[in-house]
Amino acid sequence: MRPTKLAMTKLEQYESMTEAEAVRRTVGAFRDEFFVSEEKAQLACEIAVREKKLLSKLDYKDGFSLYVGIPFCPSVCSYCSFSSSPIAEWKDKVESYLFALLKEIRAIGKMSEGHRPDSVYIGGGTPTTLEAEQMDRLLKTITENFDLSNVLEFTVEAGRPDSITEEKLAVIRKYPVTRISINPQTMQQKTLDLVGRNHTVAQTKDAFYLARKLGFDNINMDLIAGLPGEDASDMEDTLRQVEEMHPDSLTVHALAIKRAARYGQEGRKQDLHSEISQMI
Protein backbone atom coordinates (compact mmCIF):
# COMPACT_ATOMS: atom_id res chain seq x y z
CA MET A 1 0.00 0.00 0.00
CA ARG A 2 1.46 3.32 -1.10
CA PRO A 3 -1.07 6.00 -0.13
CA THR A 4 0.90 8.87 -1.67
CA LYS A 5 0.95 7.04 -5.02
CA LEU A 6 -2.84 6.83 -4.90
CA ALA A 7 -3.00 10.50 -3.96
CA MET A 8 -0.64 11.43 -6.80
CA THR A 9 -2.76 9.51 -9.32
CA LYS A 10 -5.90 11.31 -8.16
CA LEU A 11 -4.22 14.72 -8.19
CA GLU A 12 -3.06 14.12 -11.77
CA GLN A 13 -6.65 13.32 -12.76
CA TYR A 14 -7.65 16.78 -11.50
CA GLU A 15 -4.67 18.60 -13.05
CA SER A 16 -6.85 21.16 -14.85
CA MET A 17 -8.26 22.38 -11.51
CA THR A 18 -6.69 24.61 -8.89
CA GLU A 19 -4.45 22.84 -6.39
CA ALA A 20 -6.94 23.48 -3.57
CA GLU A 21 -9.84 21.97 -5.54
CA ALA A 22 -7.73 19.00 -6.65
CA VAL A 23 -6.76 18.31 -3.03
CA ARG A 24 -10.38 18.65 -1.88
CA ARG A 25 -11.56 16.10 -4.45
CA THR A 26 -8.68 13.73 -3.71
CA VAL A 27 -9.42 13.82 0.02
CA GLY A 28 -13.05 13.07 -0.80
CA ALA A 29 -12.04 10.10 -2.94
CA PHE A 30 -9.84 8.73 -0.15
CA ARG A 31 -12.71 9.07 2.29
CA ASP A 32 -15.47 7.67 0.08
CA GLU A 33 -13.61 5.02 -1.96
CA PHE A 34 -10.98 3.82 0.51
CA PHE A 35 -12.65 4.71 3.83
CA VAL A 36 -9.60 6.67 4.99
CA SER A 37 -9.96 9.21 7.80
CA GLU A 38 -9.98 12.90 6.88
CA GLU A 39 -6.72 13.47 8.78
CA LYS A 40 -4.82 10.69 6.98
CA ALA A 41 -6.26 11.66 3.60
CA GLN A 42 -5.11 15.26 4.12
CA LEU A 43 -1.64 14.02 5.10
CA ALA A 44 -1.37 11.80 2.00
CA CYS A 45 -2.35 14.74 -0.21
CA GLU A 46 0.08 17.10 1.51
CA ILE A 47 2.97 14.69 0.91
CA ALA A 48 1.85 14.01 -2.68
CA VAL A 49 1.79 17.75 -3.45
CA ARG A 50 5.34 18.07 -2.09
CA GLU A 51 6.50 15.05 -4.09
CA LYS A 52 4.90 16.46 -7.24
CA LYS A 53 6.94 19.66 -6.90
CA LEU A 54 10.16 17.69 -6.34
CA LEU A 55 9.49 15.31 -9.23
CA SER A 56 8.87 18.25 -11.57
CA LYS A 57 12.64 18.94 -11.37
CA LEU A 58 13.49 15.58 -12.94
CA ASP A 59 14.53 15.41 -16.58
CA TYR A 60 12.22 12.66 -17.82
CA LYS A 61 13.49 12.92 -21.39
CA ASP A 62 17.26 12.72 -20.96
CA GLY A 63 17.72 12.01 -17.26
CA PHE A 64 17.91 8.73 -15.37
CA SER A 65 18.64 7.35 -11.90
CA LEU A 66 21.81 5.36 -11.29
CA TYR A 67 21.80 2.62 -8.65
CA VAL A 68 24.98 0.78 -7.65
CA GLY A 69 24.67 -2.29 -5.43
CA ILE A 70 27.27 -3.66 -3.01
CA PRO A 71 25.92 -7.09 -1.97
CA PHE A 72 27.91 -7.54 1.25
CA CYS A 73 27.13 -6.90 4.93
CA PRO A 74 29.01 -7.33 8.22
CA SER A 75 26.36 -9.96 9.05
CA VAL A 76 22.98 -10.82 7.56
CA CYS A 77 20.01 -9.70 9.66
CA SER A 78 17.41 -12.39 10.40
CA TYR A 79 14.57 -10.42 8.79
CA CYS A 80 16.50 -9.40 5.65
CA SER A 81 15.52 -10.77 2.23
CA PHE A 82 17.93 -8.70 0.13
CA SER A 83 20.63 -10.34 -1.95
CA SER A 84 23.51 -9.86 0.46
CA SER A 85 26.20 -12.06 1.98
CA PRO A 86 28.43 -11.80 5.07
CA ILE A 87 31.60 -9.99 4.05
CA ALA A 88 33.83 -12.33 6.08
CA GLU A 89 32.70 -15.34 4.03
CA TRP A 90 33.27 -13.57 0.70
CA LYS A 91 36.37 -11.52 1.50
CA ASP A 92 38.39 -13.18 -1.27
CA LYS A 93 35.66 -12.39 -3.85
CA VAL A 94 35.15 -8.70 -3.09
CA GLU A 95 37.99 -7.48 -5.30
CA SER A 96 36.74 -9.59 -8.23
CA TYR A 97 33.22 -8.23 -7.73
CA LEU A 98 34.52 -4.66 -7.62
CA PHE A 99 36.60 -5.20 -10.77
CA ALA A 100 33.49 -6.39 -12.66
CA LEU A 101 31.36 -3.60 -11.18
CA LEU A 102 33.77 -0.85 -12.25
CA LYS A 103 33.94 -2.37 -15.72
CA GLU A 104 30.14 -2.28 -15.93
CA ILE A 105 30.00 1.31 -14.66
CA ARG A 106 32.37 2.39 -17.44
CA ALA A 107 30.27 0.54 -20.02
CA ILE A 108 27.02 2.11 -18.78
CA GLY A 109 28.73 5.50 -18.80
CA LYS A 110 29.51 5.10 -22.50
CA MET A 111 26.01 3.82 -23.28
CA SER A 112 24.40 6.80 -21.54
CA GLU A 113 26.38 9.53 -23.31
CA GLY A 114 24.08 12.46 -23.99
CA HIS A 115 22.09 11.69 -20.84
CA ARG A 116 22.72 12.90 -17.31
CA PRO A 117 21.67 11.14 -14.09
CA ASP A 118 19.19 12.96 -11.86
CA SER A 119 20.15 10.85 -8.86
CA VAL A 120 22.84 8.40 -7.80
CA TYR A 121 22.30 5.84 -5.05
CA ILE A 122 24.93 3.43 -3.74
CA GLY A 123 23.13 0.78 -1.72
CA GLY A 124 23.31 -2.90 -0.90
CA GLY A 125 23.96 -4.72 1.22
CA THR A 126 26.22 -2.33 3.07
CA PRO A 127 28.48 -0.26 0.79
CA THR A 128 30.79 0.64 3.67
CA THR A 129 31.86 -2.99 3.97
CA LEU A 130 34.24 -1.97 1.18
CA GLU A 131 37.65 -0.84 2.36
CA ALA A 132 38.34 2.90 2.10
CA GLU A 133 40.59 2.42 -0.92
CA GLN A 134 37.91 0.33 -2.66
CA MET A 135 35.26 2.96 -1.91
CA ASP A 136 37.60 5.57 -3.35
CA ARG A 137 37.95 3.61 -6.60
CA LEU A 138 34.18 3.14 -6.83
CA LEU A 139 33.34 6.82 -6.34
CA LYS A 140 36.17 7.92 -8.63
CA THR A 141 34.89 5.65 -11.42
CA ILE A 142 31.34 6.98 -11.07
CA THR A 143 32.43 10.63 -11.16
CA GLU A 144 34.73 10.04 -14.13
CA ASN A 145 32.15 8.23 -16.25
CA PHE A 146 28.96 10.24 -15.71
CA ASP A 147 28.08 13.91 -16.04
CA LEU A 148 26.86 14.65 -12.50
CA SER A 149 26.06 18.33 -13.11
CA ASN A 150 22.32 17.60 -13.09
CA VAL A 151 22.26 15.34 -10.01
CA LEU A 152 19.69 16.39 -7.42
CA GLU A 153 20.75 13.79 -4.85
CA PHE A 154 23.80 11.52 -4.51
CA THR A 155 23.38 9.03 -1.67
CA VAL A 156 25.81 6.56 -0.13
CA GLU A 157 24.05 4.10 2.13
CA ALA A 158 26.66 4.01 4.89
CA GLY A 159 24.27 1.65 6.65
CA ARG A 160 25.60 -0.44 9.51
CA PRO A 161 27.52 1.64 12.07
CA ASP A 162 29.97 -1.23 12.67
CA SER A 163 31.20 -0.81 9.08
CA ILE A 164 31.73 2.97 9.27
CA THR A 165 35.19 4.40 9.91
CA GLU A 166 36.64 7.90 9.81
CA GLU A 167 38.81 6.89 6.86
CA LYS A 168 35.81 5.71 4.82
CA LEU A 169 33.77 8.83 5.65
CA ALA A 170 36.73 11.02 4.65
CA VAL A 171 36.81 9.27 1.27
CA ILE A 172 33.08 9.85 0.74
CA ARG A 173 33.53 13.54 1.60
CA LYS A 174 36.01 13.91 -1.29
CA TYR A 175 33.24 13.32 -3.83
CA PRO A 176 29.96 15.13 -4.64
CA VAL A 177 27.91 12.93 -2.30
CA THR A 178 25.02 14.97 -0.89
CA ARG A 179 23.42 12.45 1.47
CA ILE A 180 24.42 9.46 3.59
CA SER A 181 22.32 7.06 5.60
CA ILE A 182 23.30 5.60 8.97
CA ASN A 183 20.79 2.91 9.88
CA PRO A 184 20.27 1.64 13.42
CA GLN A 185 16.82 0.08 12.61
CA THR A 186 16.26 0.19 16.39
CA MET A 187 17.98 1.71 19.41
CA GLN A 188 17.11 -1.30 21.60
CA GLN A 189 20.22 -3.38 22.27
CA LYS A 190 18.22 -6.52 23.09
CA THR A 191 16.64 -6.36 19.61
CA LEU A 192 19.92 -5.73 17.80
CA ASP A 193 21.33 -8.85 19.46
CA LEU A 194 18.21 -10.89 18.66
CA VAL A 195 18.11 -10.11 14.93
CA GLY A 196 21.82 -10.57 14.31
CA ARG A 197 22.92 -6.96 13.97
CA ASN A 198 26.32 -7.26 15.58
CA HIS A 199 26.73 -3.67 16.70
CA THR A 200 25.79 -1.59 19.70
CA VAL A 201 23.56 1.42 20.21
CA ALA A 202 26.69 3.34 21.24
CA GLN A 203 28.32 2.53 17.88
CA THR A 204 25.33 4.04 16.08
CA LYS A 205 25.69 7.28 18.01
CA ASP A 206 29.47 7.34 17.57
CA ALA A 207 29.16 6.86 13.79
CA PHE A 208 26.51 9.57 13.53
CA TYR A 209 28.46 12.17 15.49
CA LEU A 210 31.66 11.29 13.62
CA ALA A 211 29.88 11.96 10.32
CA ARG A 212 28.62 15.30 11.68
CA LYS A 213 32.14 16.20 12.80
CA LEU A 214 33.44 15.52 9.29
CA GLY A 215 30.87 17.90 7.79
CA PHE A 216 28.01 15.69 6.59
CA ASP A 217 24.90 17.87 6.74
CA ASN A 218 22.31 15.52 5.22
CA ILE A 219 22.16 12.31 7.25
CA ASN A 220 19.22 9.93 7.05
CA MET A 221 18.47 7.21 9.59
CA ASP A 222 16.37 4.08 8.96
CA LEU A 223 14.11 2.44 11.54
CA ILE A 224 11.93 -0.67 11.37
CA ALA A 225 8.60 -0.85 13.19
CA GLY A 226 7.59 -4.31 14.40
CA LEU A 227 10.95 -5.97 15.00
CA PRO A 228 10.68 -9.21 17.05
CA GLY A 229 10.08 -8.63 20.75
CA GLU A 230 9.41 -4.91 20.42
CA ASP A 231 6.27 -3.05 21.39
CA ALA A 232 5.13 0.55 21.10
CA SER A 233 7.12 1.60 24.19
CA ASP A 234 10.34 0.31 22.60
CA MET A 235 9.63 2.29 19.43
CA GLU A 236 8.87 5.36 21.53
CA ASP A 237 12.24 5.03 23.28
CA THR A 238 14.03 4.50 19.95
CA LEU A 239 12.41 7.64 18.52
CA ARG A 240 13.36 9.61 21.63
CA GLN A 241 17.02 8.60 21.27
CA VAL A 242 17.04 9.33 17.54
CA GLU A 243 15.38 12.71 18.08
CA GLU A 244 18.22 13.68 20.43
CA MET A 245 20.67 13.08 17.58
CA HIS A 246 18.79 15.36 15.13
CA PRO A 247 19.16 13.45 11.84
CA ASP A 248 18.13 15.42 8.76
CA SER A 249 15.61 12.79 7.70
CA LEU A 250 14.10 9.62 9.10
CA THR A 251 12.81 6.62 7.15
CA VAL A 252 10.48 4.22 8.97
CA HIS A 253 9.73 0.81 7.47
CA ALA A 254 7.14 -1.68 8.71
CA LEU A 255 8.60 -5.16 9.19
CA ALA A 256 7.67 -7.53 6.37
CA ILE A 257 9.02 -11.07 6.68
CA LYS A 258 9.61 -12.46 3.19
CA ARG A 259 10.46 -15.97 2.06
CA ALA A 260 14.12 -15.21 1.33
CA ALA A 261 14.73 -13.94 4.87
CA ARG A 262 16.01 -16.40 7.50
CA TYR A 263 12.86 -15.76 9.53
CA GLY A 264 10.79 -16.60 6.44
CA GLN A 265 12.70 -19.82 5.82
CA GLU A 266 12.17 -20.81 9.45
CA GLY A 267 8.43 -20.39 8.92
CA ARG A 268 8.03 -17.62 11.47
CA LYS A 269 4.64 -15.99 11.24
CA GLN A 270 4.08 -12.29 11.54
CA ASP A 271 1.15 -11.19 13.66
CA LEU A 272 2.13 -7.67 14.55
CA HIS A 273 -0.31 -5.52 12.61
CA SER A 274 -1.95 -3.95 15.69
CA GLU A 275 1.43 -3.38 17.38
CA ILE A 276 2.94 -1.83 14.24
CA SER A 277 -0.14 0.37 13.88
CA GLN A 278 0.40 1.68 17.42
CA MET A 279 4.09 2.29 16.71
CA ILE A 280 3.45 4.26 13.53
Regions found by a protein language model. Name each.
Residues 61-96:
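Canonical Radical SAM [4Fe-4S] cluster-binding loop centered on the CxxxCxxC motif
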Residues 84-278:
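Conserved non-cysteine loop/helix-boundary elements of the Radical SAM core domain that shape
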